[in-house]
Amino acid sequence: IEGTVKKSSEILLHEAALKARPDCNAAAHIHAPYLTAYAYCGKDIKLKCSTTFSLVFEEIPCLPYGLPGTIHIADGIEDAIKDHDLILLGNHGCIAVGKTLEDAVKIIEAAEEVLKIYHLTKEIGPVRNISDSDLEELYNNHPGSRRNRYGK
């Protein structure tokens, strides 16, 4: 990481994420409200009601709390981010990786938008999930789906 701008106290987090993902050139660490709320609760995000979420993410794992500004903020990041473009950081926020910084930020924005809609939906009534068989068909018919990108 080069340049004259002062490095973030969480530079170790960015370095660990990029080390694990040589296909990516940028990492974005943001405290987006909905994603951070899940991080505060220590909850993975698994939604079956949104085709967008299912195709792009399928799930967003949440790592345990790691002390910011120390190496512990990056505990578990290398394993988790190998198979995910977006990870929640327990009691903290989130980090996404992408080929460019714009790509990494767009990943966070997409997840945040889906979560806004999901929580509005819960206010209106029960959320109706997409069946597992329909989700399998969705994954199989979209070569760009997360499952097809990572082979899982």
Model region roles, listed by residue range:
Residues 1-152:
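Glycine-rich flexible loops
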